[in-house]
Amino acid sequence: MNAVEEPEVQRVPVVRELLASPDFLRLWLVGAFANAMRWLELLVSGVFAYEITHSALAATVVVALRQLPQLAFGAFAGAVSEAVNRKLIVMLALIIPAIVSTVLASLATTGHLALWHVALGNFVSGTMWSTEMSTRRRMVGEVAGPHRIVPAIALDSVTNAATRMIGPLLGGVAFEWLGMKGAYTLTAFVQFLAAFAIASLAHPQITRRLDLARIPADIAEGLAYARTKSTILLVYGVTIVTNAFAFSYSGLLAPLGLGAFHVSPALTGLLAAAEPIGALMGGALIALGFLRMDRRVTFVGGSAFFMVALVITALSQSYWLAFAVLLLGGFGTAGFGNMQTTLMLTEAPADMRSRLRGIVTVCIGTGPLGVLAAGALSDHLGPRDAVLAMGLTGLVLTVALSATLRRR
């Protein structure tokens, strides 16, 4: 059923009902704080790399290392989460990055922090981040129940947009005023606190026997099922294009802010927060039921709208115009992000959701390949032209995918 065909829902009371559930509230808050710290580290590591090397490629490599594990391990994380207690996976995904942040903060305090330390830390923490969609976000849907799954995921998506706004803002300020030592001390403390909060969560789960040899077959089974559903194929295809060609601009935020617009790390953090601010506003309208459109149209249209915003941003010579356009583009990513999760949960059978969502994580994991491509282009063309080339290519591919799968 399309969103336009659904009966009217009183979204505000449903959201209040969700927040009144202790288990949902805990999962929601843990996701909010942990993801804010992840985005903080992503900005801080990119700015650190660019200030040391003055190379856009070096900055994008460091950022990409945080995201590459989604491509390498995302589908396996989805399969494993059906056989291993998801609460345990979530706890490890908090504790291990907290330990990494503690080590990096200690190295910064003693004056021994090197770029390779940050790069390695990003890869280790990113490996744990690759479990997010198939574990914590699935648990959010399970706790909410099938009758509240759409507002629950919408609320979680709005919150994720807020963390992508707050994280870079905090990152820019922390880097400018506290340095790497203060930034990583903050992220370590928050992630240890989140792990403590999740420890007492009661989350019953029926698990299958873990058979590592079976995992490739599970993934193949998920892909075989996806080929029979044009909507799931659309989610996979547009997710790949959007992450590889649109969200790759995130790796160029430090070169754009510091190099192209010649602003401070704090204002670079504000530029990074522009799109998430728009996504937060747009997601709130969706969560409260004010925007009700066909889910596929919202998903594809939101992606295309954001790519148009990137093209305009790349052509802008004004920092504040770029900020405003990226903010508007965030309304597009709100539709894309909300419907990405909602379409997977409504189109996939319950026994295959983790596997199919694990494949979504792999699709998201193509983002760092785009980040690396954008970095290489930036070294030759400059950050503005790199964003322009990636945005235009992504827009063409999105339109082509939508037209092709509409005929199926």
Put a short name on every predicted segment:
Residues A3-V12, A199-A224:
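Flexible cytoplasmic inter-helical loops of multi-pass small-molecule transporters
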Residues Q10-P69, T228-E275:
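Helix-loop boundary and gating motifs at the non-cytosolic
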Residues L27, L113-L120, V235, W320-L326:
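Short hydrophobic/alpha-helical segments at membrane-entry points of transmembrane helices
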Residues G46-I52, A105-T110, I166-L186, G259-A260, ...:
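Transmembrane alpha-helix termini and helix-breaking/packing motifs in multi-pass membrane transporters
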Residues A72-F76, K87-I96, V103, W116, ...:
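C-terminal transmembrane bundle of multi-pass solute transporters/carriers
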Residues L115-G126, P151-Q205, Y249, L271-A273, ...:
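Hydrophobic alpha-helical transmembrane segments
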Residues V124-R136, G329-Q340:
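Core transmembrane helices of Major Facilitator Superfamily
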Residues G141-I149, T346-R353:
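Paired intracellular helix-loop junctions of major facilitator superfamily
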